Amino acid sequence: MAKKSKIVKNEQRRELVQRYAERRAELKRTIRDPASSPERRAAAVSALQRLPRDSSPVRLRNRDVVDGRPRGHLRKFGLSRVRVREMAHRGELPGVRKASW
């Protein structure tokens, strides 16, 4: 079980990422646009750097939705490998069976 503070901090980051996503995408478009002037590009870089650090999607951590475990995360289920195994053994994941060949 992850610390509650880490789980809450990650959720706050998710909210920040959503709040600034459009602004961040607009600035990145300006920076990448070959038709934009060097002054406009420099202004966009400066504005992008002024945005909060936690508004960058790179800083998000995929966590288990049940207990917040940060490692061994399986995107397909949104769970950690440990939780997937437990739930699969109990038959709580539809369509998941033990491998047999």
Curated annotation (Swiss-Prot):
Keyword Ubl conjugation: no
SUPFAM superfamilies from the UniProt entry: Glucocorticoid receptor-like (DNA-binding domain)
One biological process term in Gene Ontology: translation
Any one Gene Ontology cellular component term annotated for this protein: small ribosomal subunit
Entry's Gene Ontology molecular function annotations: rRNA binding; structural constituent of ribosome
Entry-linked Pfam families: Ribosomal_S14 (PF00253)
InterPro entries: Ribosomal_uS14, Ribosomal_uS14_bac/plastid
Keywords: Ribonucleoprotein, Ribosomal protein, RNA-binding, rRNA-binding
Domain of life per record: Bacteria
Keyword Zinc: no
Membrane-spanning parts: none
Cited function: Binds 16S rRNA, required for the assembly of 30S particles and may also be responsible for determining the conformation of the 16S rRNA at the A site.
Subunit structure of this chain's protein: Part of the 30S ribosomal subunit. Contacts proteins S3 and S10.
Family: Belongs to the universal ribosomal protein uS14 family.
Name used for this protein in its record: Small ribosomal subunit protein uS14A
Organism in which the protein naturally occurs: Mycolicibacterium smegmatis (strain ATCC 700084 / mc(2)155) (Mycobacterium smegmatis)
Gene: rpsN
